[in-house]
Amino acid sequence: MTNIRKTHPLTKIINNSFIDLPAPSNISAWWNFGSLLGICLILQILTGLFLAMHYTSDTATAFSSVTHICRDVNYGWIIRYMHANGASMFFVCLFLHVGRGLYYGSYMFPETWNIGIILLFTVMATAFMGYVLPWGQMSFWGATVITNLLSAIPYIGTNLVEWIWGGFSVDKATLTRFFAFHFILPFVISALAAVHLLFLHETGSNNPSGIPSDSDKIPFHPYYTIKDILGALFLILTLTLLVLFSPDLLGDPDNYIPANPLNTPPHIKPEWYFLFAYAILRSIPNKLGGVLALVFSILVLAIIPLLHTSKQRSMMFRPLSQCLFWLLVADLLTLTWIGGQPVEHPFITIGQLASILYFMILLVFMPIVSIIENNLLKW
């Protein structure tokens, strides 16, 4: 008799995705981040659900409801800080996951890659709206500045912004709808993640060498389940240390001041994981140009498969491309630093140079260096 695990319609899906899934024998710890992102998503949905039980999406009471959660709700403080820092862990895993995809040529699975880009945009939108909910100074002014960017869209811009706001400024209507969207989007993300996985399992996983691994597969369980559990333990340990020892390390102190439309904070900046994009936005003096650069800084990932000129899929055996990749990482760290600095000399110039370099590496240097490497192989 065949095992029920392999025959029952429900368990069969789980079996084919997480148990009997044929996986390459040589995938490294860089392939852990998919499962870690799944864990982050589950954690965020659960902590968010418990926070939503006590939160009120009204401008008069939003700030005090968050204070109430931290002070009066049983273990409310740990739920709130796990949710806030869980978002940071989510983005750490996301950036490493995307970086892995760039390094090892995982973008050569176009459907999986494109759904991944949609997921990245959706997660960024969710995180932005979540940051508005505590209704502190940075929440309010962040919402005002970022939504205002849409007014740069010709002809319909102003109407669009007022439609999103639900009035003539960020107010009660804005907060209520942001809460509604922030609640529903994680479930959209879950559905997209399932589709992401569906397309991945159509082709099978890539591996560090970039060479097809059909001749050498091993079952996902127990080999990679145990490996993923180790990664999950590291993730939970890091998150726990962050939550229990320095929960406000990655936050902004200004967000402990209730939102005041009459008082602008000295430096309006988003959470750390958006700073690289914020730096690119600010480095262009024109409003519409800045918005386009901001969107394109993520959307550029969609055209990377078209710019793949190398004969090899992975960067494992391409030292020149590796140098460029790590230059890109350094450039993104520079942009993140610049995004948190005030708009003054020398930060403006550094930000502009780093922004130009970011697009140049991805759109110009990578394809050219790949062609050079192809020619070096002939020698």
From Swiss-Prot:
Query: Mind telling me which InterPro entries this protein's record contains?
Result: Cyt_b/b6_C (IPR005798), Cyt_b/b6_C_sf (IPR036150), Cyt_b/b6_N (IPR005797), Cytb/b6-like_sf (IPR027387), Cytochrome_b (IPR030689), Cytochrome_b_C_euk/bac (IPR048260), Cytochrome_b_N_euk/bac (IPR048259), Di-haem_cyt_TM (IPR016174)
Name where it mostly resides. mitochondrion
Cofactor binding, per record: Binds 2 heme b groups non-covalently.
Write one Gene Ontology MF term. metal ion binding
Gene Ontology, cellular component aspect: mitochondrial inner membrane; respiratory chain complex III
Q: Which residues bind heme b b562?
A: 83, 182
List where the protein spans the membrane.
Answer: 33-53, 77-98, 113-133, 178-198, 226-246, 288-308, 320-340, 347-367
SUPFAM superfamilies under this entry?
a domain/subunit of cytochrome bc1 complex (Ubiquinol-cytochrome c reductase), Transmembrane di-heme cytochromes
Q: Does the keyword Iron apply?
A: yes
Q: Which residues bind a ubiquinone?
A: 201
The record's subcellular locations are: Mitochondrion inner membrane
Please provide an example of a Pfam family that matches this protein in its UniProt record.
Answer: Cytochrome_B
Q: Which segments of the protein form a coiled coil according to its record?
A: none
Q: What are the record keywords, sorted?
A: Electron transport, Heme, Iron, Membrane, Metal-binding, Mitochondrion, Mitochondrion inner membrane, Respiratory chain, Transmembrane, Transmembrane helix, Transport, Ubiquinone
Q: How does it sit in the bilayer?
A: Multi-pass membrane protein
A single GO BP = mitochondrial electron transport, ubiquinol to cytochrome c
Q: How does it assemble?
A: The cytochrome bc1 complex contains 11 subunits: 3 respiratory subunits (MT-CYB, CYC1 and UQCRFS1), 2 core proteins (UQCRC1 and UQCRC2) and 6 low-molecular weight proteins (UQCRH/QCR6, UQCRB/QCR7, UQCRQ/QCR8, UQCR10/QCR9, UQCR11/QCR10 and a cleavage product of UQCRFS1). This cytochrome bc1 complex then forms a dimer.
- Role this protein plays: Component of the ubiquinol-cytochrome c reductase complex (complex III or cytochrome b-c1 complex) that is part of the mitochondrial respiratory chain. The b-c1 complex mediates electron transfer from ubiquinol to cytochrome c. Contributes to the generation of a proton gradient across the mitochondrial membrane that is then used for ATP synthesis.
Family affiliation? Belongs to the cytochrome b family.
Q: What is this protein called?
A: Cytochrome b
